[in-house]
């Protein structure tokens, strides 16, 4: 515990930091600047905080997002006054949309130096609009004990709001008067003699912040689900802190209902395939056969989290409008299709635990939940089981599950055979090869645009326990490299799959190389432009397509890597790539560039993605 009694600002900032560390903070990302000096000094000198200096604010924010996403705990992000904080904005949007806890601390000038052209001053109050979970401006630092208590409790509340009821960013605007440096001030001597640190911080522990009570559970119609003979589970993109428990819970639900499970590639489910015998990975390709898609129409869909990326799947659901139940504990609206939907504000793990408990107690799974009751012993809302005699369960139709299983088997075999025999450097094969070649448990960050879609199309199920990571909150390409480095920092050796434009958009992330602890291999699909635009109608209009949409940059990545002292290799064959991935290094950053033909790859997709279904199951 360290309270810096040199002056008013050092006392204030060190109490702020000490409060955060007692709540559980371990990492702070600090951008250089003058006005944030008290915060930087406090974080940098605290023995329990890993303080990481990063030059570029946008890169810093995405790196912090990556660290927070991996750990599940808030990361502090500090900058000086002026436009510095504006560069955090893209990562704050992503943090809100993808539910990542961040604590944004923007230093500011005091009120008397605003709106008077005092320099490096903008309006930072509510700088990030409605994206933070909570935001406030702290008082100007003071030595009065009541104000120090106010600071402590405000920081506790900020920590809580970054985590509950739904994780996301919190913004504290922090004004400081001069002197900003830790210049000694005799005025703090009296406070130092009276300050009882252990008493002041006695109640500040991780246990002092409790989750908010869960939102009241809706009626969970388990009996209705079990009675349905054309039910389906769709598991969308997910980055759970405990991927195995997440996959086990979904497996329990799927097998207890005998529902096929459509599993997004940006989910750990495909990498714990042994847990889920009803897993369907080729749904996008299956649904391209419109006659077969009609035969597979469900009457009921249980959606776990957000929908998968697939446009084919979304269009199919939108066309047939089945009743949908969305299982997710967050308070967001997760129905982008505006269908016949009921949100169930509960985690899939809670439902999986309920199923396990009933099996353990030899009760019939399927008894279902009914209206909520409050357990008066702990005031936690609990589901109540419907009595066995009240159940009405009709026999399930095994043919619906078999139709999906047969289609999956046929198309999976066709995709795997096609990919295995493909000699050319087609960018989609990179995603398939990663599913076959990465060491078990490898953290894999997947960039937006075509990489996420290639993973959904081609990623083959297995038991590798690979954990996919991504920025699909706002779906932008900004911060790709920096986020991946944040995921990989002090983690198992990691891999990133990215296109050339996404990497170029964040090359300042390479400046992290001298502070980065761990290893990241970057699989760079270089098709010299935006490959995803080749899949859109605008690609037929030339000009302006190539110059203004594909935007080729003609970059020599070997020279770029040399500038940043990053290892580089050009990939000439799939066998070479497999060898380089079989055992990942433990330190540093390396780029493995796969040169591809953007237009040839787009033509291949247009020709082949709809041709894998040869016969109906």
List PLM regions with ranges.
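Phosphate/pyrophosphate-binding active-site segments
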Residues: 2-8, 316-365, 379, 383-452, ...
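N-terminal cofactor/phosphate-binding cores enriched in small/glycine residues
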Residues: 5-94
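Active-site diphosphate/adenylate-binding microenvironment
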Residues: 13-17, 21-24, 34-35, 39-40, ...
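A short, small-residue-rich loop immediately preceding and capping a beta-strand
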Residues: 26-29, 50-52, 70-109, 297-305, ...
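Glycine-rich, anion-gripping cofactor-binding loops and their flanking helix/strand elements
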Residues: 87, 220-223, 235-325, 333, ...
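Thiamine diphosphate
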Residues: 105, 112-126, 432, 459-616
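Glycine-rich, acidic loop regions that bind phosphate or pyrophosphate groups
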Residues: 106-158, 263-362, 390, 394-407, ...
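Glycine/aspartate-rich loop-and-adjacent alpha/beta segment that forms the canonical ThDP
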Residues: 166-169, 173-214, 581-617
């Amino acid at each position: 515990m360290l309270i810096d009694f040199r002056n008013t600002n050092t006392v204030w900032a060190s109490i702020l930091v000490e409060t955060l560390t007692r709540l559980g903070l371990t990492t702070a990302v600090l951008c250089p600047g003058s006005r944030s000096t008290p915060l930087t000094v406090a974080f940098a000198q605290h023995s329990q905080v890993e303080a990481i200096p990063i030059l570029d604010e946008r890169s810093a924010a995405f790196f912090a997002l990556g660290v927070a996403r991996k750990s599940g705990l808030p990361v502090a992000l500090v900058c000086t006054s002026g436009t510095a904080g504006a560069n955090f904005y893209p990562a704050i949007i992503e943090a809100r949309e993808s539910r990542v806890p961040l604590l944004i601390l923007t230093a500011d000038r005091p009120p008397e130096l605003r709106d008077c052209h005092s320099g490096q001053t903008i309006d930072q109050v509510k700088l990030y609009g409605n994206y933070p979970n909570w935001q406030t401006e702290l008082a100007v630092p003071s030595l009065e004990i009541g104000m120090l208590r106010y600071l402590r409790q405000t920081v506790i509340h900020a920590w809580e709001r970054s985590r509950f009821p739904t994780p996301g960013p919190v913004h504290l605007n922090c004004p400081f008067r001069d002197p900003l440096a830790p210049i000694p001030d005799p005025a703090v001597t009296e406070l130092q003699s009276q300050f009882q640190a252990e008493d002041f911080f006695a109640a500040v522990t991780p246990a002092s912040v409790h989750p908010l009570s869960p939102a009241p559970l809706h009626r969970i119609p388990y009996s209705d689900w079990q009675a349905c003979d054309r039910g389906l589970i769709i598991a969308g993109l997910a980055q759970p802190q405990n991927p195995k428990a997440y996959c086990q819970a979904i497996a329990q639900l799927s097998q207890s209902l005998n529902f096929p499970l459509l599993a997004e590639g940006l989910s750990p489910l495909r990498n714990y395939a042994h847990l889920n015998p009803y897993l369907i990975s080729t749904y996008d390709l299956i649904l391209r056969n419109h006659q077969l898609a009609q035969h597979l129409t469900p009457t009921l869909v249980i959606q776990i989290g957000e929908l998968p990326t697939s446009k084919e799947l979304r269009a199919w659901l939108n066309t047939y409008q089945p009743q949908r139940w969305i299982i997710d504990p967050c308070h967001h609206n997760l129905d982008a299709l505006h269908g016949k939907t009921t949100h169930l504000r509960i985690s899939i793990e809670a439902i999986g635990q309920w199923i396990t408990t009933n099996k353990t107690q030899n009760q019939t799974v399927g008894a279902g939940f009914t209206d909520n009751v409050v357990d008066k012993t702990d005031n936690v809302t609990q589901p109540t089981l419907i009595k066995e005699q009240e159940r009405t369960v009709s026999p399930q139709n095994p043919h619906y599950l078999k139709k999906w299983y047969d289609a999956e088997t046929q198309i999976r075999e066709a995709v795997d055979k096609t990919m295995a025999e493909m000699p050319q450097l087609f960018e989609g094969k990179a995603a398939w090869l990663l599913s076959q070649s990465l060491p078990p448990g490898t953290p894999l960050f997947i960039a937006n645009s075509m990489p996420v879609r290639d993973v959904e199309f081609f990623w083959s199920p297995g038991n590798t326990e690979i954990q996919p990571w991504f920025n699909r909150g706002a779906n932008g390409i900004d911060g790709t490299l920096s986020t991946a480095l944040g995921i990989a920092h002090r983690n198992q050796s990691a891999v990133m799959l990215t296109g050339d434009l996404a990497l170029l958009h964040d090359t300042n992330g390479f400046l992290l190389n001298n502070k980065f602890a761990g290893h990241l291999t970057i699989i760079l699909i270089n098709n010299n432009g935006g490959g995803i635009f080749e899949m859109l109608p605008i690609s037929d209009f030339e000009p302006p397509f190539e110059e203004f949409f594909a935007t080729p940059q003609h970059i020599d990545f070997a020279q770029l890597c040399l500038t940043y002292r990053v290892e580089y290799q050009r990939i000439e064959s799939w066998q070479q790539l497999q060898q380089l991935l079989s055992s990942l290094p433990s330190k540093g950053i390396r780029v493995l560039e796969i040169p591809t033909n953007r237009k040839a790859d787009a033509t291949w997709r247009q020709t082949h993605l709809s041709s894998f279904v040869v016969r109906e199951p």
